[in-house]
Amino acid sequence: MMVPAAVVDNTIADLLHHLEAGDILIDGGNSYYIDDIRRAKDLAPKKLHYVDVGTSGGVWGLERGYCMMIGGEDTVVKYLDSIFATLAPGIGNIARTPGREKVAGTSEQGYLHCGPNGAGHFVKMVHNGIEYGIMAAYAEGLGILRSANVGNRKHEIDAETTPLRDPEHYKYDLKLPDIAEVWRRGSVIASWLLDLTAAALLEDPALSKFAGRVSDSGEGRWTIKASIDEAVPAPVLTTALQERFSSRGEGDFQNKLLSAMRYEFGGHLEKPAGK
């Protein structure tokens, strides 16, 4: 299966009529790992096996191969090894980690049995949380570069506007497609996500076909919940998730309330949009 997390249980219920003892269900989508644990327990009395596979690679996976993070019983995962080996990218042209040649396992091939039921989707969950943070960092950094010409703009002079000190320090008209491209070439922050960013900026520097309403499919939220349960600080991942909420207007009421309080205590009027 590779279906949205919200319909996995219904899909399993439909499939049960066609399954026999010893059959294996593979969930290759982005289910919540806690649901994986429950499903494996529910299916065990029927002698059905459940394997959770966190799959990364996006639409490019068909060409590049899929990175897979796997959770399930040892014997079952070993039985499926040839399937995972076929779908995985293999070592390819990625340089080996020094010392890795002495380590047995499949991780270099692009797939890994992470642990018992739920472990595969747990690792993929955190992978996606990290993805949120990396994407946010690129977006914020390039946003700062895009506004590096703010010193050339006309600025309102009133009590509601923070003055720009030293506007002569911000008079750079920077070409973001070229900057993203040069970063791809030997920089510390080079990555596949940066490759995709460079391609998008080259095609349309203004990103005119996007409204900037960024969805979240659940993995970021689950990652933050896990960080709270584990008492592990994750401020970058948390902020990246919260920013996605804000991008969809989820903070509009709070912002209106801030404006209302400023008006009540100081008579401050909201400035029109774009001012």
Residue ranges and their predicted role:
Residues 63-88, 124-132:
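Short beta-strand and adjoining strand-loop segment in the mid-core
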Residues 24-29, 125-126, 209:
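Short glycine-rich or small-residue beta-strand-to-loop segments that form or flank ligand, phosphate
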Residues 1-38, 42-48, 61-74:
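Rossmann-like NAD(P)-binding element
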